A protein has these predicted regions:
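Conserved glycine-rich Rossmann-like NAD(P)H-binding loop of the short-chain dehydrogenase/reductase
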Residues: 25-38
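NAD(P)-dependent short-chain dehydrogenase/reductase
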Residues: 154-209, 215-219, 224
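Mid/C-terminal beta-alpha module of Rossmann-like enzyme folds, strongest
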Residues: 221-256
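Conserved Rossmann-fold NAD(P)-dependent oxidoreductase catalytic core, especially the SDR/UDP-sugar
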Residues: 74, 99-141
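N-terminal Rossmann NAD(P)H-binding glycine-rich loop of SDR-like oxidoreductase domains
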Residues: 3-24
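Rossmann-fold cofactor-recognition segment
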Residues: 44-56
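NAD(P)H-binding glycine-rich loop region in Rossmannoid oxidoreductase-like domains
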Residues: 54-93
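Active-site helix of classical SDR
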Residues: 141, 145-148
Length: 256
């Protein structure tokens, strides 16, 4: 990677990934954002930024051309809880936006990273040591867009040779950006509430274990998969990754 565009650079992953990439690479690491979600502070001052609405294919193409982009990190998405409240918008961004990114990548020869999620799995998916190739039958719009995104990314790789890559993130734990509406965000939100002395009502039941990962490990995965030798890939879209698993009661007892 030399010149990188991060679409959704001010979100939970993007705000930290952009800074990490800038600390590693000397090329253009462009923070793509939409009006109302502008980069601030060090994120704004440490490198170039551009308005990039993922629903606008021409805008993506113009930015790729201007900064000679060779790799796109497509991080634009509505998180799970928000996607359930706004399913039409979730599909427009998650799938319509991905289609735009892949079309630009096809015509302008870019590699693309689009994160997937454990949200692709459903009630019939094996819960322990979940296989790489297994049942994917989500019951949420977020999960549906992620499964569809994996399939579309694989299609563009097989049909057009677009270098698409992905990992299935578990819940991500970070203090840099406040929780944004993900099902697993309780694991961060609970600490904000505790620090403020506020009551916290957990949306996840006691005994419900979910896979989690610290953000630095997630950034490492997102970068290393794009640096990996593609000739050695068994899968492209998408690899299972995990770090730890816990339920809300474990966090509660630690805070208490």
């Amino acid at each position: 990677m030399k010149n990188v565009l991060i679409i959704g650079s001010t979100g939970q992953i993007g705000s930290e990934l952009t800074m990490k990439l800038r600390s590693i690479y000397n090329g253009n690491i462009v923070a793509g954002y939409i009006p109302g979600a502008e980069p601030k502070g060090e994120l704004a001052e440490s490198g170039p930024s551009a308005i990039v609405d993922i629903t606008n294919e021409q805008q993506i193409a113009e930015t790729v051309s201007k900064y000679h982009i060779d790799t796109i990190y497509n991080l634009a998405a509505l998180l799970s809880a928000v996607a359930e409240a706004k399913p039409q918008l979730a599909w427009k961004i998650g799938m319509g936006g991905l289609f735009n990114v892949l079309e630009v990548a096809r015509t302008m020869k870019c590699a693309v990273f689009t994160p997937s999620s454990i949200g692709v799995f459903g009630n019939n998916t094996p819960k322990d040591k979940t296989p790489q190739d297994t049942i994917r039958n989500p019951r949420t719009m977020y999960g549906v867009t992620k499964v569809s995104g994996e399939l579309l990314s694989d299609y563009y790789n097989i049909r057009f040779g677009v270098d698409t890559r992905s990992v299935r993130f578990p819940g991500l734990i970070s203090y840099v950006t406040p929780p944004g509406g993900g099902t697993t965000d309780y694991a961060v939100d609970i600490y904000y509430s505790a620090a403020k002395g506020e009551k916290f009502v957990c949306p996840i039941g006691k005994g419900t274990y979910m896979d989690m990962m610290y953000m630095p490990d997630a950034l490492r995965a997102a970068i290393e998969i794009m640096e990996a030798d593609p000739s050695k890939f068994v899968h492209r879209n998408s690899f299972n990754i995990a770090a730890m698993s816990f339920d809300p009661d474990i966090i509660f007892n630690k805070i208490k």
